[in-house]
Amino acid sequence: MPAQGDNSDTPRAISTERACVKKIFPLLLIPAVLTGCATEPTTVRIATHDSFAISDELIASFEEDSGLELEIIRMGDTGTLTNQLVLSKDEPIADAFFGIDNTFRGVAEENSIVDGEFAAIDYSDVCFNYDRHYFLDAGITPPTSWKELTDKTYRGLTVITNPKSSSPGLAFLASTVAALGDDYESYWQQLKANDVLVTSGWEDAYFTEFSGSSGEGDYPIVLSYASSPSAEVRDNGESQTAALLDDCFRQTEFAGVLAGAANPSGADELVQFMLSDQFQSAVPELMYVYPVTDVELPESWAQFATPATSTVDLPELNDRREEILGTWESIFE
């Protein structure tokens, strides 16, 4: 028998105790539910290079379908983008990335900055472009291959990009190694002696130094892409520029989810959106590169954005990266 006054085992006491638990338990759940709602991601961040372009309509479509706000973080050229993602991998600055290409993919893989697969989004052929008007006005025959750029005829006419920070720059360096073998170092020495200009990134080279885009630059030959002439079609229906389509380097750009992302599901949703017909159809006119899916291309591309007639590749690029960059630095720095 319980002591007098102790009614803890009586039906009334048990009923009261259960009632108290029922009242307290929902109250304990409320903060947990609210906390879960507060941490639900509402934004997805993508780190990319400065040349990434996406229309307001595409942004609105993604945000409406996903319920997420898209934040774009631009980080310079491809090399700078890759290096910054490596440096910040312990505290990722974004959820997804776009713009690491096959020349810098090895760096990303070695440093394990990507969670899952690299999704190919677009491709382009790194080729030299020249200003047709300049050569017509000057009465000079334009080059037919990058191998001719060491000729004195083209002294001081060419602008390229730094292979340490620029993916087109590294692609061209790889092209010379693949095509010339051990003679690539001699080629670069001759190119420097021919007063080639080196810029840090493609945008500076193309939009500032090249005479064929804005018409304000001093250099009529630029390292760019086979598709770039499609962006320079004038009112007369002709492109002011043309591309040298032999011995180009095929560049593929990837997107993916960053390891340690705060919103990996949102990042994956963004990558899938970039593979949709809606996004892929916009790629040519937004970024002047080729989509990876079989979507219809703009009519002008058949005439002004012809893919390279021949390409070169350097499968051992990742293994020889430091070696060939060191050789390049010894010549230019």
Predicted segments, located by residue:
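Periplasmic solute-binding protein
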Residues: 102-112, 120-141, 169-179, 252-256
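Periplasmic-binding protein-like
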Residues: 153-164, 273-297
